[in-house]
């Protein structure tokens, strides 16, 4: 009888201790390394649970070495009670066999500040529902979806990005995304947009017209390899702080015109390959003359481009980034005007041939007068 009483007391003590033990978030990996499950309870030690971070490049998740085998991620019902997560950075990075995420709606992101690399290199994911994410405190979204190469849909239209400073590589290499709504993004605090949409090669439309870029310093490769984009409105971009525009529009092969008349390039040191291989581009609207330390191949591979002069494959650097003797076309007028010889030159405006040669007077045919193409009869 005494022995049974002692046993019962011990059992009650165990239950009491378990009840007192604090709940905590953790993750477990199945014995075959294919399923990663997230819990929030007091059984971490019993389940052999692993810490859920915060993680970084120097401090990877405990499951990182097995991430290539993970095919399924599950959020247990208990995780809905967890409000202590401050970082989801690197959680599923390089899970290139991951095809299903179950219960993601149970992840409370209200206090999360870092989502960098969260789904980076999830190359097998075809769908992902992040529409419920509360991102009001997030400051870093860099590399968040980079290399999600067969993801066909992604709803980020409700993301609150008011505090985000880094969007570098955010959607880079999302090759199969046919649409992406970022029109509501508040980018007033973003400083880095490099590679943000790089190689989103299936996108045909992208509305960035409301982007506030006043604090952005890096736009390198921002729209690089957006092969299917047929239009892109960057007319309101404030680029006063930008130092790098290298390869910004490279390989945007479907664009036929681009208005960069608002661009302030006073601080830009790199324009190399900026419009390289925009093979359908005929018109770049800009009233200013640009200059830059590095501008090699800036206009290379743009055979249809015509501004003040016709395109010459041997003239592809920033020397020709102007509307008077280069490839820019001034805004606010028709591209070609027809005048009589007597009225062809107004107010002693500079006159050039299509090859860029300074003329003393207009000649019959096409002339460049005041940065406009003028046909003299």
Enumerate the predicted regions with their spans:
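N-terminal capping/linker segments that flank leucine-rich repeat
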Residues: 2-94, 99-108, 210, 285-334
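Short strand-coil-strand connectors
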Residues: 32, 355, 369-372
């Amino acid at each position: 009888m005494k022995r049974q009483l002692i046993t019962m007391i011990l059992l009650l003590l165990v239950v009491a201790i378990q009840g007192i033990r604090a709940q905590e978030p953790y993750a477990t990996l199945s014995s075959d390394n294919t399923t990663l499950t997230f819990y929030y309870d007091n059984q971490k030690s019993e389940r052999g649970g692993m810490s859920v971070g915060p993680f970084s490049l120097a401090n990877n998740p405990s499951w990182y070495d097995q991430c290539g085998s993970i095919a399924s991620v599950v959020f247990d019902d208990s995780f809905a009670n967890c409000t202590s997560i401050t970082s989801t950075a690197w959680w599923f990075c390089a899970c290139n066999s991951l095809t299903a995420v179950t219960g993601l709606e149970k992840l409370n992101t209200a206090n999360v500040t870092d989502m960098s690399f969260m789904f980076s290199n999830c190359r097998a994911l075809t769908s992902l529902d992040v529409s419920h994410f509360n991102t009001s405190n997030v400051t870093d979204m860099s590399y968040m979806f980079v290399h999600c190469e067969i993801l066909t849909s992604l709803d980020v239209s409700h993301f609150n990005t008011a505090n985000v400073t880094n969007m570098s590589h955010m959607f880079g290499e999302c090759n199969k995304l046919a649409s992406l709504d970022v029109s509501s993004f508040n980018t007033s605090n973003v400083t880095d947009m490099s590679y943000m949409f790089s190689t989103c090669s299936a996108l045909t439309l992208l509305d960035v017209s409301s982007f506030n870029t006043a604090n952005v310093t890096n736009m390198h490769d921002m729209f690089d390899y957006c092969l299917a984009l047929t239009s892109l409105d960057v007319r309101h971009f404030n680029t006063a702080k930008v130092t790098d525009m290298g390869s910004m529009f490279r390989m945007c092969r479907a664009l036929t015109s681009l208005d960069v008349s608002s661009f302030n390039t006073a601080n830009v040191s790199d324009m190399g390959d900026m419009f390289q291989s925009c093979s359908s581009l005929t018109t770049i609207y800009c009233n200013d003359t640009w200059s830059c330390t590095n501008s090699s191949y800036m206009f290379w591979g743009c055979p249809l481009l015509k501004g003040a002069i016709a395109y010459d494959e041997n003239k592809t650097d920033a020397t020709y980034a102007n509307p008077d003797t280069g490839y820019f076309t001034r805004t606010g007028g028709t591209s070609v005007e027809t005048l009589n010889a007597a009225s062809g030159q107004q107010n002693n405006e500079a006159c050039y041939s299509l090859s860029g040669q300074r003329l003393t007077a207009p000649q019959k045919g096409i002339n460049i007068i005041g940065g406009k193409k003028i046909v003299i009869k």
